[in-house]
Amino acid sequence: MGNSALDLNPPNATFHLSTHGSDWLWAAFSVFGVSLLTVVAWTFTRPRGARLFHQIAIVVLTTGSLAYFSMASDLGATPVPVEFRGEGTRQIWFVRYIQWFITFPLLLLELLLATGLSLSDIFTTLFMSIVLVITGLVAALVPSTYKWGYYTFGVSALFYIWYVLLWHGPHTTFAAGGVLRRGYILAAGYLSFLLLLYPIAWACAEGGNVISVTSEMIWYGILDIFAGPIFLFFFLWELRGVDYATFGLHSGKYTDKSAYAPNTAQAAGTVPATTSTGAAGNV
């Protein structure tokens, strides 16, 4: 049985996704799905208190799986009049921007938590990633030349992200030592290069309408796979031997259930209940 996604969900624009493009998106969805299941299984091999980075990866891969399922099904797009290509409309995939709105800040958070950056620096960097995504979406939805103004705002935010990843972050103190610093520098350089390619893809696709929607899907799909599953597997592998206690990421929320089981004296109210601290703070 062939791919009938476009028959069940007909395209809603002049320049739209092809069946071959949908086939590629199903393949990308499979990559995200298999990666998600792998990370979930990997997470359960980690002790409590050493799962935070794996759980962030689960959120990223779950979001990516949902987005690619939607796009492969030809859902999550809206028609917008084209620029530089005569008459007609082009499918703008808002579901992709929803994906990036969630995943880009989390990918940066995954990376920056390994550094000695302050929470205020991390928060500002995550905000700039949100600015990057939102300005890209607004620019894609604007049919006039004003879209390039939003594009400029987004690229400006990207320069700030590069500054933090490539300069500010590496010059902080890494509590986990030089091994993690080396891994961070490799991961930060890798992610920064990928972030350079996204605005180029946008200018050729939603911005200038130079490439087809199917070519757009292939380009973005490759970038998302390299920025999602491949990046996350590399980063988690680099963290496999690191003592999570050095990060100081204790939430204080998790406590053994036994701590809530009062003895007879506590139940009678004669002895104050105490909270076990041995397992507190695991995330």
UniProtKB/Swiss-Prot annotation:
| Primary localization class, coarse | membrane
CC terms in the record's Gene Ontology section: endoplasmic reticulum; plasma membrane
- Name under which the protein is recorded: Protein FDD123
Any one Pfam family match given in the protein's UniProt record, by short name? Bac_rhodopsin
Query: Which taxonomic lineage is given here?
Result: Eukaryota, Fungi, Dikarya, Basidiomycota, Agaricomycotina
The record's section on InterPro entries has:
Arc/bac/fun_rhodopsins, Yro2-like_7TM
How does this protein sit in the membrane?
A: Multi-pass membrane protein
Is Transferase set as a keyword in this record? no
Q: Which organism is it from?
A: Trametes versicolor
- Membrane-crossing residue ranges in chain numbering: 24-44, 52-72, 97-117, 122-142, 148-168, 185-205, 217-237
Which family is this sequence assigned to?
Belongs to the archaeal/bacterial/fungal opsin family.
Q: Which UniProt keywords apply?
A: Membrane, Transmembrane, Transmembrane helix
Question: Where in or outside the cell?
Answer: Membrane
